[in-house]
Regions:
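Short, surface-exposed, charged amphipathic helix/loop patches that serve as local interaction elements
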Residues: 30-113
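Extended acidic low-complexity intrinsically disordered regions
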Residues: 1-20
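Short acidic-hydrophobic surface loop/beta-edge motif
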Residues: 18-29
Length: 113
């Protein structure tokens, strides 16, 4: 019998737990430091599925759920609730979506949130 060799997988395969700080201009025209984390393929797939759902309520909350999954406080805890995310100004949502796209390398997503 051959012994199974333990393989070390590259960290680049996985979502990092790193908390990423970004200066983001919000609706008041001022820059604020916000924190984000990368999302997994599962969260990404849920977002895409929600965007194409036949259920209007699911589609309406797709971007809110993505923002909630990625935006955190400095300690990595969720920064806002789904209810708060639902109340984001459209321009702010688009800006946050662009930051989330950059962090996750979703080039095609920029400008779609």
């Amino acid at each position: 019998m051959s012994e199974k060799t333990e393989q070390t997988l590259p960290a680049a395969l996985f979502v990092s737990n790193e908390i990423i700080a970004r200066e983001v201009e919000l609706g008041d025209g001022k820059k604020h430091t916000l924190h984000f984390k990368a999302v997994s393929h599962v969260v990404f797939n849920r977002w895409v599925t929600a965007l194409t759902s036949t259920d209007e309520a699911v589609r309406d909350r797709a971007h809110s759920r993505l923002v909630c999954a990625s935006m955190v406080d400095a300690d990595g805890e969720p920064a806002l609730t789904i209810e708060q995310a639902d109340r984001l100004k459209p321009k702010v949502l688009r800006t946050l979506g662009d930051v989330i796209a950059e962090i996750n390398d979703f080039a095609d997503m920029r400008g779609n949130a």
